[in-house]
Amino acid sequence: MCIRDRPKIADYPFTTLHPNLGVVHQDNKEFVIADIPGLIEGAHEGSGLGHRFLGHVERCKGLLHLIDVTSENIKRDYLTIIRELEAYDTSLSEKKQIIVLTKCDAVKDQKLNFAKEQLKKLNVKKVFGISSVSGENITKLVRQLQDLISSMNKIEDNQDGLEKVSSWSP
């Protein structure tokens, strides 16, 4: 995986202050990903530049939620985002989503499994655990994103009545 954009990364909350776009390259395919700053409670009312950030979310085909597994309350963190999306525009919560627990290298398996169970109780069907430090499950996640985008493109093409045309080269 290669993302050429190098947004600021640090070990404190809200490092991302502006949306960043990056192109992900994997398996001879590519897609654009938007890194949107974290939403806080009240974002739908404009708190923490919420309207501006949520406006960017509206233009995304799908959502990738990154939740810090070291958080004291994973359930609250997840529900805060979902509630803010719904309060801003109910169609946002209907977008396809992938839920990811980050910093999995920083916790024991017991904590990771507990976090996954908490999310499954909220009807989250699949939860990925990744580590940006070790690279654990990053490639697997990118391939899952590719599959999600591909399936969404097929649905859009079918709704538009478009036929899949194989590529042509002279």
Which residues are covered by each model-predicted region?
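Short secondary-structure boundary/capping elements
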Residues: T16, E45-L49, K111
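C-terminal-of-GTPase-core extension/linker across diverse P-loop GTPases
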Residues: T15, E72, R76-L79, R83-P170
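Hydrophobic residues in beta-strands of the RecA-like P-loop NTPase core, especially within AAA+ ATPase
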Residues: I33-A34, I67, L101
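A general structural signal for well-ordered alpha-helical packing
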Residues: E30-I33, G50, Y78
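Switch I (G2) and immediately adjacent beta-strands of P-loop GTPase domains
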Residues: Y12-A43, R59-G62
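Short, small-residue-biased leader/transition segments that mark boundaries at the very start
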Residues: M1-I3
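Flexible beta-alpha connector loops of hexameric P-loop NTPases
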Residues: R6-I9, P37-G46, D68-K75, D105
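Inter-motif core of Ras-like GTPase G domains
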Residues: G48-S71, A87-L92
